[in-house]
């Protein structure tokens, strides 16, 4: 696919599975562009798709936008015949996928605090733009700045966008990988949202 230029007038309109979103809870963040590679008939790497992702959803009382960059249904990933491309396009993933992976970008409106939640997965969380407070259910917290990474090992947590002292939007990206069930003191910890 040829390089695509972003129309500045459309920078706050994001494609959803139902069409374009007319309002965006985190104005000022540039549109995320996804570049997917593959191979030509000679086995050389080529760009096969450039877009903004297949699945977008306004979440958190219309205060955040989730963009699924890519997802897979198995590990190792089957890429022959482009079966992974078909799966990612046709299936909006849940929080995480058993034996698979999810790459999710979330744009947060200013001062948004997510609910306390737990995913039974190993999550790599990267601050792309802004500053966030990662709060654990124990009460412990850490400030994360652009480029910082959290390794979330299925613990209950929440995110607070503190960018510009809570006056600006922020963006994070997560890569979620499946993990075995978490058992502590004979208690099986499940996914939850409070």
From Swiss-Prot:
GO terms for molecular function: oxidoreductase activity. It comes from the Eukaryota. InterPro entries: Cupin_2, OryJ/VirC-like, RmlC-like_jellyroll, RmlC_Cupin_sf. Pfam families: Cupin_2. Residues 106-175 form the Cupin type-2 domain. Keywords: Oxidoreductase. Pathway: Secondary metabolite biosynthesis. Its EC number is 1.-.-.-. CDD domains: cupin_BLL6423-like (cd02231). Cupin-domain-containing oxidoreductase; part of the gene cluster that mediates the biosynthesis of virensols and trichoxide, fungal natural products that contain or are derived from a salicylaldehyde core. The pathway begins with the synthesis of the reduced chain in virensol C by the highly reducing polyketide synthase virA via condensation of one acetate and 8 malonate units. Belongs to the virC family. This is Cupin-domain-containing oxidoreductase virC. It comes from Hypocrea virens (strain Gv29-8 / FGSC 10586) (Gliocladium virens). The gene is virC.
């Amino acid at each position: 696919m040829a390089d695509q230029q972003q129309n500045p007038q459309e920078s706050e309109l994001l494609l959803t599975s139902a069409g374009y979103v007319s309002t965006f809870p985190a104005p000022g963040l540039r549109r995320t562009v996804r570049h997917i590679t593959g191979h030509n008939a000679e086995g050389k790497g080529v760009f096969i798709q450039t877009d903004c992702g297949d699945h977008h959803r306004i979440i958190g009382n219309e205060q955040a936008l989730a963009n699924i960059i890519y997802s897979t249904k198995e590990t190792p990933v089957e890429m022959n015949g482009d079966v992974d491309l078909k799966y990612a396009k046709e299936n909006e993933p849940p929080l995480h996928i058993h034996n698979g992976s999810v790459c999710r970008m979330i744009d947060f409106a200013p001062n948004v605090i997510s609910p306390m939640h737990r995913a039974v997965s190993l999550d790599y969380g990267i601050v792309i733009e802004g500053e966030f407070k990662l709060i654990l259910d124990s009460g412990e917290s850490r400030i994360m700045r652009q480029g910082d990474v959290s390794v979330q090992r299925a613990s209950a947590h929440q995110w607070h966008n503190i960018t510009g002292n809570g006056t600006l939007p922020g963006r994070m990206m997560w890569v979620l990988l499946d993990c075995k069930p978490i058992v502590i003191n004979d208690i099986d910890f499940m996914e939850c949202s409070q």
